Every structure is written in structure tokens, then in C-alpha cells.
């Protein structure tokens, strides 16, 4: 799918181009694109994954920061006049601008490893406009996104992602599928925003703060981490054991803490 125009991957953009056609076909199958859907790809590179999707949907938006790649992308995909290229930084891009009241967007991409976590937080803040997301990420990031309470990788990213979305780790992709080959395994993740939040918080900033405080010293107990925020009476009212470590709490527990602190502060 990807053509052979020369372009050296740029380290500052975190570029690793996917060239394994078998993996590309498998990703497209997981996405399951349909004609007429509004699919947005972040960092299309030379268009390997893009071609597999737009061949079905017949239209597509892509967000690409590397201006030198855009002419290559347009040449590779010249057969698709309904390809819209946005030369922009995905970290600052307003994805809601591509939605309509009738149609949410689907977001896909082989995300640059160096900005994958902040980019996911940026997308989660616009989750109401997104039907689902399929990303290639460093395997450890996917493991963190999908981690459950008690897992060693369960943390701030796990809680906030799962507050907004159902998260599924789909399959692992080895370094040999990329040029240049990264030093670690990658994985495909599916994130599907909840149509109705199962545990809505009254103030999202408070939830973010309580999760950040909770995990700032993950080997310490909740009593220690929330010192000055919650006392023993508060933990009793919440029915949460203050001797637990933060990785034992689920999303609902953190939401209850946030809502409790909002009410307590009046």
C-alpha cells in the first residue's frame, strides 16, 4: 500500500512508518470502516493505513504535522479526491470541528510514541464527538490503558481512559513491521467512548486532580496521599479503606472521592 517516495523518518516527530501489509489489513479489519463514515487519521505518514480505509469509505480526513510528507501522501493517494489533509498539530487540533449533529467521527492512527499519552488526554476531552478510536501505540501504553485495578501498570492513564471509554487491547505488532524499527513492541487498542457515562463526576477537573493526587506516590497508602484532603471520617463516609494503595481503587471509587470532595468544599 505504501509507495516508495524517499522520506527519512524524523525523530522529533516520533515517526515509525508501518509497512507490513498483513498488519495493515488486520488493522483495517479491526476498524471495520463503512462507506460514508467520517474517519479521521492522525499522522497518516505515507498513507499505508489511509489507503486501506479510504478505499472503503471513499472520503477521509487526515491530520499531519510534517509538511514534507503531505506531497508524498497526496501523490500516493491521488485516486481519492475526497481525501482532506489538515496540516496541523494533532495536540492542538479541534476534532469536534469535523463532526455534525448527525455524525460522530471515528479516529485512527499510528500515534507518535513521544506524544501518545498527552494526545490521548487531548482526545478524551473531546470524547463526546467520537464514536470510537483505534490506535497503534507502544505496547506498554496499551497495557496501561487497559490495566485493571490491582495490575502493576494500573494508574492515572487507566482511570481517566476508562472513565470515558471501554478499552480493549486487540493485538501485538513487532518492531519488524516498521521503518525504522522501534526498540519495543507495539499494540493495537480500541477505545469506545461511553454513550452514557457509567459513573459521571460532577466536575471533571476535580476527578483529574483526585486521580493525580492518588497516584503521585503509588507505593504510599490512600491516607498518606490524600493527607489534608480526606481524613479518617471522610474515608469512613466513603466506605473506602485508607490503608489501601491507589491501584486498588476502581474508576467508580475515584469518582466517589471527587464528588465527595466537591460536596465537602461546598
Swiss-Prot record:
Coiled-coil regions, chain positions: none
Entry EC number(s): 2.1.1.182
Record CDD domains: AdoMet_MTases (cd02440)
PROSITE patterns: RRNA_A_DIMETH, SAM_RNA_A_N6_MT
One Pfam family this sequence matches: RrnaAD
Gene Ontology CC terms, in alphabetical order: cytosol
Catalytic activity: adenosine(1518)/adenosine(1519) in 16S rRNA + 4 S-adenosyl-L-methionine = N(6)-dimethyladenosine(1518)/N(6)-dimethyladenosine(1519) in 16S rRNA + 4 S-adenosyl-L-homocysteine + 4 H(+)
One term of GO molecular function: RNA binding
SMART domains referenced in this protein's UniProt entry, alphabetically: rADc (SM00650)
Record's keyword terms, sorted: Cytoplasm, Methyltransferase, RNA-binding, rRNA processing, S-adenosyl-L-methionine, Transferase
Locations listed in the record: Cytoplasm
Positions of S-adenosyl-L-methionine binding: 16, 18, 43, 64, 89, 110
SUPFAM superfamilies: S-adenosyl-L-methionine-dependent methyltransferases
KW Disulfide bond (keyword) present: no
Top EC class of this enzyme: transferase
Ranges that cross the membrane: none
NCBIfam families assigned: ksgA
Family according to the record: Belongs to the class I-like SAM-binding methyltransferase superfamily. rRNA adenine N(6)-methyltransferase family. RsmA subfamily.
Role this protein plays: Specifically dimethylates two adjacent adenosines (A1518 and A1519) in the loop of a conserved hairpin near the 3'-end of 16S rRNA in the 30S particle. May play a critical role in biogenesis of 30S subunits.
Protein name per its UniProtKB record: Ribosomal RNA small subunit methyltransferase A
Protein's organism: Marinomonas sp. (strain MWYL1)
Classification lineage: Bacteria, Pseudomonadati, Pseudomonadota, Gammaproteobacteria, Oceanospirillales
Gene it is expressed from: rsmA
Amino acid at each position: 500500500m505504501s509507495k516508495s517516495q524517499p522520506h527519512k523518518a524524523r525523530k522529533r516527530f516520533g515517526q515509525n512508518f508501518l509497512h507490513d501489509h498483513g498488519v495493515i489489513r488486520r488493522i483495517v479489519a479491526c476498524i471495520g470502516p463503512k462507506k460514508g463514515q467520517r474517519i479521521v487519521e492522525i499522522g497518516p505518514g505515507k498513507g499505508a493505513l489511509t489507503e486501506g480505509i479510504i478505499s472503503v469509505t471513499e472520503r477521509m480526513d487526515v491530520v499531519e504535522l510534517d509538511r514534507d510528507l503531505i506531497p508524498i501522501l497526496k501523490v500516493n493517494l491521488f485516486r481519492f479526491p475526497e481525501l482532506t489533509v489538515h496540516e496541523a498539530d494533532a495536540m492542538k487540533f479541534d476534532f469536534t470541528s469535523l463532526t455534525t449533529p448527525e455524525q460522530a467521527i471515528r479516529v485512527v492512527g499510528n500515534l507518535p510514541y513521544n506524544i501518545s499519552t498527552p494526545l490521548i488526554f487531548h482526545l478524551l476531552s473531546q470524547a463526546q464527538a467520537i464514536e470510537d478510536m483505534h490506535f497503534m501505540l507502544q505496547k506498554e501504553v496499551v497495557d496501561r490503558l487497559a490495566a485493571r485495578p490491582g495490575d502493576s501498570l494500573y494508574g492515572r492513564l487507566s482511570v481517566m481512559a476508562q472513565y470515558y471509554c471501554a478499552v480493549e487491547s486487540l493485538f501485538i505488532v513487532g518492531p519488524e513491521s516498521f521503518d525504522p524499527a522501534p526498540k519495543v513492541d507495539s499494540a493495537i487498542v480500541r477505545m469506545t467512548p461511553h454513550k452514557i457515562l457509567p459513573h459521571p463526576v460532577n466536575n471533571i477537573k476535580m476527578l483529574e486532580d483526585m486521580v493525580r493526587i492518588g497516584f503521585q506516590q503509588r507505593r504510599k497508602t490512600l491516607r498518606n496521599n490524600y493527607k489534608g484532603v480526606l481524613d479518617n471520617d471522610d474515608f469512613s463516609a466513603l466506605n473506602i479503606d485508607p490503608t489501601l494503595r491507589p491501584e486498588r481503587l476502581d474508576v467508580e471509587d475515584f469518582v466517589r472521592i471527587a464528588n465527595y470532595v466537591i460536596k465537602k468544599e461546598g
